[in-house]
Amino acid sequence: MKGGASGGTLASMIEAVKAAKNDVRLRKEMGNPYILCPEKKDLSHRQVSVRGPVFDQDFQSWSGPFIMEAINARVVLRSHMLSGMPYGNNFLYREQMITGKGFKGRLSALTLSTMLGLFAVGVFMTPTRKILQRFLPKPGEGPSPEAQAAGYFDISLLGKTASGEKLDVQVTGDRDPGYGCTAKMLAQSGLSLAFDFDEADREGGFWTPATLMGDKLINRLIDHAGMTFDLK
């Protein structure tokens, strides 16, 4: 993966941390992986996130935390709920950054984990947060068009059943994941909503892309957004 962060994204993260620091209820909600599933009250199976360097046996590689898991996992869990719990009440989902094998991979995972941890602590504490804000990009600043065009992402999705069966999907994008590709995803999502559905196809509500648009959106992303989805 190759991409950058904008000042607006960082400012949003900082404001969320500031709000949670002063609100116990908000902190609990932000720490609840099922916060987007209020319609189903019996979801209590513990989700396990990668917090530090971990050697992943499936990929035979070291890995560290992925900063977007806190958002992505909650959307996936809501999709699962809206789909009728097809994977069962014990469904687990997590994301992590693969850093490679051997000593170099372990060191990269440790560095990644340490930097994210220090950033989180720095943002949480007022004095260090003010210092960080002097050096971080400001809202409106971010990756240049050239940097976005040079970016990319490569995601490995591995599904495992209770009986041990595995399903592997590779997803790639040809632009910066946070901006170049995200802009195309948003555009194709809007076009899908406008042209791929009759009004009677879906009721209103708090849907996710997977449960509302599904394969129709995937086809658009393949045809018009420079993305690939490869089932292995």
List PLM regions with ranges:
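C-terminal catalytic/substrate-binding lobe primarily of soluble NAD(P)-dependent oxidoreductases
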Residues: 1-232
